[in-house]
Swiss-Prot record:
Its job: Responsible for synthesis of pseudouridine from uracil-55 in the psi GC loop of transfer RNAs.
Key words of the record: Isomerase, tRNA processing
Catalytic activity, as annotated: uridine(55) in tRNA = pseudouridine(55) in tRNA
Protein name stated in the entry: tRNA pseudouridine synthase B
Family: Belongs to the pseudouridine synthase TruB family. Type 1 subfamily.
A biological process term (GO) from this entry: mRNA pseudouridine synthesis
PANTHER family: PSEUDOURIDYLATE SYNTHASE TRUB1, TRNA-PSEUDOURIDINE SYNTHASE
InterPro entries xrefs: PsdUridine_synth_cat_dom_sf, PsdUridine_synth_N, PUA-like_sf, PUA_sf, tRNA_psdUridine_synth_TruB, tRNA_sdUridine_synth_fam1_C
Amino acid sequence: MQGFINLDKPFGWTSHDCVARLRKMLRLKRVGHAGTLDPAATGVLPIAVGKATRLLQYLPSDKAYKATVRFGVQTTTDDLQGEIISSQPCGGLSLSEVKTSLSQFIGKIEQIPPIYSAIQVEGKRLYDLARKGETIEVPARTVEVFSIDVLDWREGDFPELDVAIACGSGTYIRAIARDLGAIFHTGGTLAALIRTHSSGFNLTDSLTLTDLETQLQAGTFEPTPADAALQYLPSVTLPSISAQKWCQGQRIELNLETVGKVRVYQAETNIFLGIGELQTGVLIPQMVFEPIS
């Protein structure tokens, strides 16, 4: 078996928990995931099975979330799973004020990751240092947020904001919640997070673990084809002789102006062969997925 599974990660599970469960369900060792999700988050977790694990590095990095920010609360983890540092009612906060501030988080921004995160500093993961009580300065990173759209606003002593966020890889939604609360000196924390899109996969097409188990028992499960999430890349087809040479590591001269990574197929069978790099009319093998003889 090889391909992808668009998994709807359940609440409370780590991404590694999901991989371990799928290894048992599928009776395969070669299982991996793209884009780690926090245990408290749910939604799209792309799972690669078999040889498709070699394609994880080529998946698109765009992601989308539905997030709930709670104002007036600050925690150690920047979500509701951590210890409360401060709690102060802020019923006077208005949606118009919040909307005005959202523009500060759109575009390429400098973001300090939460101290409870898998980021490594000096070879150590931040959450390991945090659990030991060690204090360390977390360096800011450049991330990109494409859009933030307001979905709902609930007034109260601890008002909540629902937003849809589209962003690039490495963006921490917990950090956005924290920093948004800091602007108003109220504190802010992430109350809920659903990933609605990741690496070419959408929540509407995802499977829960129960769905997957049901399909496996019925013998109806088929993984998503290995090249399905790579449709953002242009494609190149090679006749059988050229395809064979390319799969053996040879460069193929092509009269094409395209430059960059491409999907490569055998013309006669439309078999996905792998990922190539086009450079000035030459197709260079990057990753041979399906060698042919």
